Amino acid sequence: MEIDDIFASKKANPANEKSNDSKSEAKAPKKGAKTKSTPSRPKPTNNQDDLFLDPKGASGRKRTEEGFLVYDEEELNIGQGGGTPDCPFDCQCCF
């Protein structure tokens, strides 16, 4: 059996189905017939409490135009420590 013979029957079937579908579509729209419309889903609302939200926003972190993360002074410990002679590079107070 040839491959073309197998697929020839497959090609003939969609042509028959299309002609049957077009006939049924022509009969479907009748005057005075009520059409059912599916009810739309209600839009979800944000029920999150503002007291428990992250102050930096829901998206996580701010980013620069290049895509780098933006850190604030508290995260970098700027202004904290610096009381030892090893500061700012060899100290253990800033960690």
From Swiss-Prot:
Residues 18-28 have a biased composition (Basic and acidic residues). InterPro entries: DUF1764_euk (IPR013885). It comes from the Eukaryota. GO terms for cellular component: cytosol; nucleus. It holds the Pfam family DUF1764. Signal peptide: none annotated. Residues 35-49 have a biased composition (Polar residues). Residues 1-64 are annotated as: Disordered. Transmembrane segments: none annotated. This is Uncharacterized protein C6G9.01c.
